[in-house]
UniProtKB/Swiss-Prot annotation:
The UniProt record lists the keyword Acyltransferase: no
Tissue-specific expression: In 16-day-old embryo, expressed at high level in the sternum and tibia, at low level in skeletal muscle, heart and gizzard. Not present in skin, liver and brain.
PTM summary: Requires vitamin K-dependent gamma-carboxylation for its function.
Swiss-Prot/TrEMBL GO biological process terms: cartilage development; cell differentiation; ossification
Main location: secreted
Name this polypeptide is given: Matrix Gla protein
InterPro entries from the UniProt entry: GLA-like_dom_SF (IPR035972), GLA_domain (IPR000294), MGP (IPR027118)
Length: 103
């Protein structure tokens, strides 16, 4: 009889140790509601229109107008940028880069 009581107590202890609901599992919000609503589900999935807009922006970056390329070149050169503040970017580009000399 004593062995049966010890065996039952041991079984209860093993069951309590293995079936315990830890506090970490209760912290998860999925425990109470495992399903997402439509707004949250669509928050991390991009649609085709968003991808198409990104692709168009990349194409526009590659095919820049000549004036925009000249302005960026002038902005990288400090003296040209200072000249552009007084006379404008087209005049500054012509002043510093317009007359290239070939040696």
């Amino acid at each position: 009889m004593r062995a049966l009581i010890v065996l039952v107590l041991l079984a209860v202890l093993v069951m309590a140790a293995t079936c315990y609901e830890s506090h970490e599992s209760m912290e998860s919000h999925e425990y109470l509601n495992p399903f997402l609503n439509r707004q949250r589900a669509n928050g991390f999935i991009r649609d085709d229109t968003g991808l198409r807009a990104v692709l168009q922006e990349r194409i526009r970056e590659r095919n820049k107008a000549p004036q925009e390329r000249q302005r960026e070149i002038c902005e990288d050169f400090h003296l040209c940028e200072q000249y552009a503040l007084n006379h404008g970017y087209p005049a500054a580009y012509r002043h510093y880069f317009g007359r290239r000399r070939n040696k």
